[in-house]
């Protein structure tokens, strides 16, 4: 596999793709490169094309930083589907859900900074809370992963606290949290009970029509312990998110109300709402 380019590599790729595109003086490729961690060369080419299309659509002579910002959201979060008809009730649920993610992400230390929160449907999601890492990360600390579990659970917790019910909207969050917790236990040795061991060995079985299958190399008793540890980690994230959101219920209400009114909030706007400005 080809590794994803680092910040210098991304700047170089952007230079190549923008060489034939007119840019305004305020466009700084270095800043765009810094704000696109994890982007592949193809993603960056797509970003430049999208920004150029946006500028052309708005009859601009050159591409601006705003065009790049909007294009980045499109590449990262999917295309806006404003034509999708959503009931007021569903919109309200989505606002609480995304406000829950955003508030937990903002209140926990050592997490990736918030980039944007929206309740405009994008791709297959009804809303999106986007975080952007400050710099390249190749390894993750245990605490960072603990916090990530709480952030993933924030949406479901907010629904329960504010609406007193659960929806299927948290399905993907739950899947991602369970997968992360399983890796913490089975691959990264981050469970005190299970110790620094790998459970399950990956074997290539491409010829059988499978890419990778996890081969079980442990007893049924160990399998039960693994399941318990995974559950403990995910429920730990759930409990932390619930506690944070209950303590800051008023801010949660204000944040979801602001989302209902404005549909999209950037990092500064979220910060101001949390600070009560």
Task: Describe the role of every protein-language-model region.
Residues 2-69, 74-79, 152-160, 187-197:
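Conserved C-terminal "switch" segment of AAA+ ATPases
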Residues 12-13, 25-27, 84, 234-235, ...:
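Short hydrophobic/aromatic segments of transmembrane alpha-helices and their interfaces
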Residues 43, 100-101:
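Short hydrophobic/aromatic residue motifs in ordered secondary structure
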Residues 93-96, 102-277:
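Soluble catalytic regions of large protease machineries
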Residues 83-93:
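Short pre-active-site segment immediately N-terminal to the catalytic Zn-binding motif
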């Amino acid at each position: 596999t080809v590794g994803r380019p680092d910040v210098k590599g991304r700047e170089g790729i952007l230079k190549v793709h923008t060489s034939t595109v007119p840019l305004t003086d305020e466009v700084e490729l270095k800043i765009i490169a810094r704000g696109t961690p994890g982007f592949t060369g193809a993603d960056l080419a797509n970003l430049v094309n999208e920004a150029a299309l946006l500028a052309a659509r708005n009859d601009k002579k050159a591409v601006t930083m705003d065009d790049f910002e909007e294009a980045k959201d499109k590449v990262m979060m999917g295309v806006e589907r404003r034509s999708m008809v959503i009931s007021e009730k569903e919109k309200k649920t989505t606002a609480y859900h995304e406000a829950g993610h955003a508030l937990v992400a903002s209140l926990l230390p050592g997490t990736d900074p918030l980039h944007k929160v929206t309740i405009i449907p994008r791709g297959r999601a009804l809303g999106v809370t986007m975080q952007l890492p400050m710099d390249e990360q190749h390894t993750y600390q245990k605490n960072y992963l603990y916090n990530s579990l709480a952030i993933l659970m924030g949406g479901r917790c907010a629904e329960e606290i504010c609406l007193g019910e659960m929806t299927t909207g948290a399905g993907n969050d739950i899947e991602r949290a369970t997968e992360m917790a399983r890796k913490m236990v089975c691959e990264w040795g981050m469970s005190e009970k299970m110790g620094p061991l790998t459970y399950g060995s990956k074997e290539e079985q491409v010829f059988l029509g499978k890419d990778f299958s996890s081969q079980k190399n442990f007893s049924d008793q160990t399998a039960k312990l693994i399941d318990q540890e995974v559950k403990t980690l995910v429920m730990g994230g759930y409990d932390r998110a619930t506690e944070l959101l209950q303590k800051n219920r008023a801010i949660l209400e204000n944040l979801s109300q602001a989302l209902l009114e404005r549909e999209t909030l950037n990092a500064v706007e979220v910060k101001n709402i949390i600070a009560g400005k």
